[in-house]
Every structure is written in C-alpha cells, then in structure tokens.
UniProtKB/Swiss-Prot annotation:
Key words of the record: Cell cycle, Cell division, Septation
Family as reported in the entry's similarity comment: Belongs to the MinC family.
Task performed by this protein: Cell division inhibitor that blocks the formation of polar Z ring septums. Rapidly oscillates between the poles of the cell to destabilize FtsZ filaments that have formed before they mature into polar Z rings. Prevents FtsZ polymerization.
Biological processes, Gene Ontology terms: cell morphogenesis; division septum assembly; regulation of cell division; regulation of cell septum assembly
UniProt keyword Signal present: no
Disordered: annotated span: 102-125
InterPro entries: CAP/MinC_C, MinC, MinC_C_sf, MinC_N, Septum_form_inhib_MinC_C
UniProt name for this protein: Probable septum site-determining protein MinC
SUPFAM superfamilies associated with the record: Cell-division inhibitor MinC, C-terminal domain
Annotated organism of origin: Escherichia coli O45:K1 (strain S88 / ExPEC)
Assembly behavior: Interacts with MinD and FtsZ.
Length: 231
C-alpha cells in the first residue's frame, strides 16, 4: 500500500472532438441532435472537447455551452482557441483550454488518375492490434472493428458495423451503433460486461452460461439477441 494519499500518473483517453463551424448556438444544437440520433450508443452523454479554431464570427459562449450541454453531451474542455476574449469567457466558466499536438502539414493533392476498370469494392475496417485498456473507448464509424488483442473490463468497443475480438473480451461491445440490425459480434473468449447489437443488449449475467468464456458469435434473430458457438 502506498504511503502517500495520492499518486500522479500519466494516462491517455479516447475522446470525441466536436469542431464548431458555426457560431449560432441553435444551429449547433440541431446538428448535434441529428448526429447523436445516428449513433446514440456512441454519442449519448459522451464526454467531448469543443474545437473552436474554425469560428470566424463572434460567439456567445454561454449560449453555445448551454446549447451543446442541452443535447446531453458533456463538455470537458475547449481546444483551438486563439481569441483572448473568448479564452477569458471559457475560463470564467471553469472549462480548461486544451492544447493539441502539432498537426502535420497537409500533403499536396495527388495528380488525378484515370479511373481503374473493374475495381473491386473495399469494405472499410478499423484494426486495433494492441490491448484495449479499462477506460478506453474505441469507435469505428461506418465500418467493422477488429481487435487482435485482449479487451479489459471497463473498456468499450463501438462500431457501426461488425465487431471481431481475437482475444479475451471483458469489456463492452456495441455493434450496429447506427442501427444496422444485420451486424454481428465475434469473440474468441466471451467474458463481456455488455454486448449490444443495434440497441438490443445483454449484461454479463444474461449471457448464457455455456457460452461464457468460450468462442461465440452473437447476432439478432427475429429482433432478439442470440448466441451460438464460433467454429
């Protein structure tokens, strides 16, 4: 046991950054409501950082903060702020001004090429080949998510497509986050805290005992969550 009451450690977290391109709070509120409706499992009540670097017109920060908070999103900081007056307003509300890492200079656009004939469509996939630790949230928008390592309890995987976990799955897995009921979850070792497909979910104690800790495949059948062995 440590002899000191606190201990400071470096850590990293996965957060969504909302880039504001409009200074009118009502417009931002409606745009966020629409975005949350598309992927409620990922965005509802999510912690976010607001990036204000693209704002050119003056903004009523108090009204903007209320508009964002009214959607259920939790503003934990602001980035991209260069205006001294806006900085003062933000800090007065108790929100930290966050400094982002330096961005790489954009590469010049490649010269246009003639379209290739008979091109085979490619399905996008997000691949994670490192362990997903407690507190991490990984989202794969409009694609499948593949994790080739273990997922700790307290971690969260979210994908608009399918989820594949080739390791011990102890966290939460939410496939079909944007409502696709044809998506599936594949695990080589199912010990999840929660599994969900298009909003239909099981908590850990609802997973049939014969599949717990086993290789399993989950999908919706007649709008009900089902599980079967993964062969």
């Amino acid at each position: 046991m440590s002899n000191t009451p606190i201990e400071l450690k470096g850590s990293s977290f996965t957060l969504s950054v909302v880039h504001l391109h409009e200074a009118e709070p009502k417009v931002i509120h409606q745009a966020l409501e629409d975005k949350i409706a598309q992927a409620p499992a990922f965005l509802k009540h999510a912690p976010v950082v607001l990036n204000v670097s693209a704002l050119e017109d003056p903004v009523n920060w108090s009204a903007m903060h209320k508009a964002v908070s009214a959607t259920g999103l939790r503003v934990i900081g602001v980035s991209g702020c260069k205006d001294a007056q806006l900085k003062a307003e933000i800090e007065k509300m108790g929100l930290p001004i966050l400094t982002e890492g330096k961005e790489k200079a954009p590469r010049p656009a490649p010269a246009p090429q003639a379209p290739t004939q008979n091109t085979t469509p490619v399905t996008k996939t997000r691949l994670i080949d490192t362990p997903v630790r407690s507190g991490q949230r990984i989202y794969a928008p409009q694609c499948d998510l593949i994790v080739t390592s273990h997922v700790s309890a307290g971690a969260e995987l979210i994908a608009d497509g399918n989820i594949h976990v080739y390791g011990m799955m102890r966290g939460r897995a939410l496939a079909g986050a944007s409502g696709d009921r044809e998506t599936q979850i594949f695990c080589t070792n199912l010990m999840a805290e929660l599994v969900s497909i298009a909003g239909e979910y099981w908590l850990s104690d609802q997973i049939p005992a014969e599949f717990y800790g086993k290789a399993a495949r989950l999908q919706l059948v007649e709008n009900a969550l089902t599980v079967q062995p993964l062969n």
